[in-house]
Amino acid sequence: MRLARLSTPIIYDENQKFEIGKMVQIGDGTDATIFATGVTVSEAIKAQEELKQKGINVRVIDVHTIKPIDEEMIIKCAKETKRLISVEDHNVIGGLGTAIADVLAEKYPAKLEKIGINDTFGKSGKAQELMHYFGIDAEAIFNMFN
């Protein structure tokens, strides 16, 4: 399921270089890492800003390409932060969270919390309402820390 009908904010300037298979780190928090892809990156950044006000410093990792997965970044984040969370506008089975979990299981065992669409049928509605309904918006990410 993809909910990316929203107008999303511009995160990077025009000089940002992207490399296939290399994630981009946004912030350097050590309390948690939030791996996000697509429209959920801006939601993760909103949550990051709100969490900082509570004294919780998280890093957001923009997974702009899932395949090939950036194993190096996943392991680095697992070593450097206390919590790992993936968030995606996709089924929690077979998506970003699963790809990260596979790396962790094989290379550096660590707990991963997944935010996404549970294995259920989709709904119709406005994109932001659906993100809230399925619990993949900034509020849901923020609430993971309460």
Residue ranges and their predicted role:
Residues 2-146:
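Thiamine diphosphate
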